[in-house]
Amino acid sequence: MTQFNPVSQPAGGQASFIAVDWGTTNLRAFLMNQDGHIQAQRDSDRGMLKLGAAEFEHVLSDLLGDWLTPDLPIYMAGMVGSRGGWQEVPYLHCPIHLDDLSEHLFWLTTSLPNKVAIVPGLRSTGVAGLLDVMRGEETQLLGALDWLEEQDRAAESPIFCLPGTHCKWVQIKQGEVTQFSTSITGELFARLNDESSLVKGLPKSDQLNEAAFQKGVLASQQAGGILHHLFSARSRFVCGELMADDVRDYLSGVVIGHDVSDVLSSLERPTVPVLIIGSEALSARYALALSSLNLTSEFLAANEASIRGLKRLASRQVKSAVYPAIGA
């Protein structure tokens, strides 16, 4: 797995806008300069799930403090625009060019001196023809495309993988999102790893047991389906094929292995590296699963992708010099 260098570093210069990544559990704000680099960062644990509808503005105001000035527009991405967030913002229908997100920002009515916008999520169909949605990942995808353009790779059409609680697999052609599919991979593994009989009484570790993980990935590629393969964690342990400290990473390999192979079996085989956007640790697991299928991958940190995406949205607003009406 090739790892990209960070796309933004702490920098000086004149502040230009504020980028906000507001997820279910955390809130991060970045003061950005005119070149799109970070001047300062402020973090909070006041994610969407911890707030009532009337609390969002107050929480943001407290966090930003002296950043609250009329000449610094605020661009927010993530679950802040979901049902249960600050304001539910309608999904945009795919196919859609990611640069067109800047034309569909939802401008909030607030008592803050800054203009405040939420980036809309996307709605499409997955590989099974079923409805699918994303919110927050669209901004990361825009950031990834911006990076590819900077590297003179705009003509490439990689498959994008955004692992997490719900993993997104995205197809983009010439900057246009054509289709994406969501897997409940992370949430499923969390339940199995915390509550299931498969791991009861077994040790936990923060370190990846790569050999055990690879065994799980290989099991996922056999006949029988995921339900059968999951139980094999128990049977292989009690029969001595797995050690106690193998089981959790074996389960992770089964779940991630199925995510990778099940989705990719419905798509054309990638001819360029799969672009993984996420945390380094989780992305490394996906890279291992991809390599078992003789596929290469590249890694871009989710935080870096979000910042770059919001920077691109902000720059397009400045170029157009037009801010839509509030509440639109």
Regions found by a protein language model. Name each.
Residues S16-E55:
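Short glycine-rich, Thr/Ser-proximal phosphate-binding strand/loop in the N-terminal lobe
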Residues N26, T271-A289:
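Glycine-rich phosphate-binding loops at beta-strand->alpha-helix junctions
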Residues L51, R123-A154, P158-P163, K168-A219, ...:
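Glycine-rich phosphate-binding loop plus the immediately following alpha-helix
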Residues S61-P73, Q151-D152, V260-P270:
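Phosphate/pyrophosphate-binding loops at sites that engage ATP/ADP/AMP, CoA/4′-phosphopantetheine
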Residues W67-L131, Q174:
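Short beta-strand-loop/turn "lid" adjacent to the catalytic site in phosphate-handling enzymes
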Residues A219-D262:
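Adenine-nucleotide phosphate-binding core of ATP-dependent small-molecule kinases
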Residues E298-A328:
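Glycine-rich phosphate-binding/hydrolytic loop that grips phosphoryl groups
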